Design a protein with these regions (language model features):
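Surface-exposed coil loops of outer-membrane beta-barrel proteins
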Residues: 95-134, 138-214, 221-223, 228-230, ...
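Short loop/turn motifs that connect adjacent beta-strands in outer-membrane beta-barrel proteins
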Residues: 1-11, 52-67, 142, 172-174, ...
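Beta-barrel outer-membrane channel/assembly domains of diderm bacteria
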Residues: 1-145, 168, 381-386, 392-397, ...
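Residues that define the transmembrane beta-barrel architecture of outer-membrane proteins
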Residues: 9, 41-47, 126-131, 158-162, ...
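Residues on the lipid-exposed face of transmembrane beta-strands in outer-membrane beta-barrel proteins
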Residues: 47-53, 133-137, 164-168, 211-217, ...
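Outer-membrane beta-barrel translocator/channel fold
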Residues: 77-78, 176-237, 241-324, 344, ...
Length: 438
């Protein structure tokens, strides 16, 4: 819906309603002593409304000033975990977990994550968020600044940012500064109010910051960067991308990208544990992928490797691997994170797909190996745009996780424990979503 007011200013109103569901094949009991948990099934209903406007008269072409506000509200229409009891500790009460997807709120600094029971977390869920509230100024394509709450395009922050970013472009070079003091999620699958994605000892948020220097021509993109959080970590890295789209006039398009980043952790953080592995002082992560398009076909592959605990602070709030993997497709009793976040893990992925008019069919496979757990999955996804405003998605994924001896599902606070037996758990599921947008 578009409009013009005062004969000079433009605005756009957009809205969507939708639902997301995951039907898990594993509906087991909970036994925390043995590390046995169900995958969890749930169905959401959501609705969002957004207004974006231009605050400058149309006649001013070199300058742009935008403003936007938007919010979303949702609910769990079905939750298979709502009344589950832990057989190993029935006095602990109900053990709901799907609040993780719809309304997770454990304090801005995550200060209640260890203090509240699962039932208290369900009771304190906030299935609503004001995800957009921003000002965006640009001068031509040379300089720009954006601040407030808005969709994040940053490499290591998915969802919505609460902060600011600035860019300056000179010829083929671009400098970008990005700062975040909060992250939120707002879609059919997740609603999460703004919280500090990284904090200092759950006492204060100094903000996570990023500086990029980008050089780009029609053949190559080279982007050294550094991400840092005061008193926690510094993570220099770089991206190199080659894409044939801009210079090869062909039915083929081949994109190859290589990322590397090297988190260096502070003394206090290096002595902590992340996903049952000591964080340590030094680490590295490498990610390489290739995507190929030919006519209506697409296929590709990727490899993601952690050396040490590269995801302890950077990566699990968003990373370049997100478009390739559903990074939160495990049980919510593991905080839903896939095992490629584990220390010293390696993940190999491949996919092939075809578009048929408004239908996309894609087959994909994923293998993860790590000291803590191995995972294998093979799935197929169907995406169909019924009309201009109606969208459907269906995904069937066969998924198995083997927790190695010495590690246990949902247990992250210390390292190898020989008392923990190996478990093999089915994480297969059927996912679907539908939405109406205008």
């Amino acid at each position: 819906m578009h409009g013009v007011f005062l004969s000079a200013f433009e605005y756009q109103i957009s809205a969507r309603v939708g639902s997301f569901s995951r039907i898990a094949f594993n509906q087991s009991i909970i036994n925390s002593k043995k590390g046995i948990y169900p995958t969890g099934s749930y169905v959401t209903t959501t609705g969002a409304l957004q207004i974006d406007s231009s605050l400058l008269p149309k006649g001013i072409e070199s300058h742009k000033l935008g403003f936007g506000v938007g919010g979303e509200i949702g609910a769990l229409a079905y939750d298979s975990t709502k009344f589950l009891i832990d057989e190993a500790n029935p006095k602990a009460g109900f053990q709901p977990a799907n609040w993780y997807y719809m309304g997770r709120w454990e304090g801005y600094l995550m200060q209640y994550s260890e203090k509240w029971t699962r039932e208290q977390k369900a009771q304190n869920a906030r299935p609503y968020v004001l995800y957009n509230l921003y000002l965006d100024y640009q001068y031509k394509d040379i300089f720009g600044i954006k601040l407030g709450r808005y969709p994040s395009k940053a490499l290591f922050l998915s969802g919505f940012n609460q902060g600011f970013e600035v860019f300056y472009r000179w010829k083929k070079f671009k400098i970008v500064w990005f700062s975040t003091f909060g992250r939120a999620l707002a879609n059919e699958q997740y609603i999460r109010d703004f919280y500090a994605p990284v904090n200092y000892k759950q006492k204060i948020n100094y903000g996570m910051h990023n500086f990029n220097l980008i050089y780009e021509n029609k053949y190559i993109r080279i982007a050294p960067f550094i991400w840092f959080y005061p008193k926690n970590f510094n993570a220099p890295g770089f991206e190199i991308t080659h894409d044939t789209k801009s210079y090869w006039k062909s039915l083929w398009r081949i994109q190859t990208t290589f990322y590397a980043w090297f988190p260096l952790y502070s003394d206090y953080l290096s002595k902590d544990y992340y996903r049952a592995a000591l964080v340590g002082k030094k680490s590295a992560s490498l990610f390489v992928f290739q995507r190929v398009h030919f006519r209506s076909y697409r296929f590709g592959w990727s490899v993601y490797k952690n050396f040490g605990n590269g995801s302890a602070q950077l990566g699990w709030n968003g990373s370049p691997v997100d478009p390739f993997y559903d990074t939160k497709d495990d049980t919510p009793y593991e905080d839903a994170y896939s095992n490629f976040y584990n220390a010293n893990s390696i993940t190999i992925n491949a996919f092939v797909g075809k578009s048929i008019k408004n239908l996309l069919v894609q087959l994909y496979g994923k293998l993860t190996y790590s000291p803590r757990a191995d995972a294998q999955s093979l799935g197929v996804t169907f995406k169909y745009d019924l009309k201009k405003h109606i969208y459907f998605m269906l995904m069937v994924n066969g998924y198995q996780i083997t927790m190695h001896r010495g590690y246990k599902v949902g247990f992250f606070t210390s390292g190898y424990n020989p008392d923990f037996a190996q478990t093999i758990q089915n994480r297969s599921y059927l996912m679907s979503s539908m939405s109406y947008r205008f």
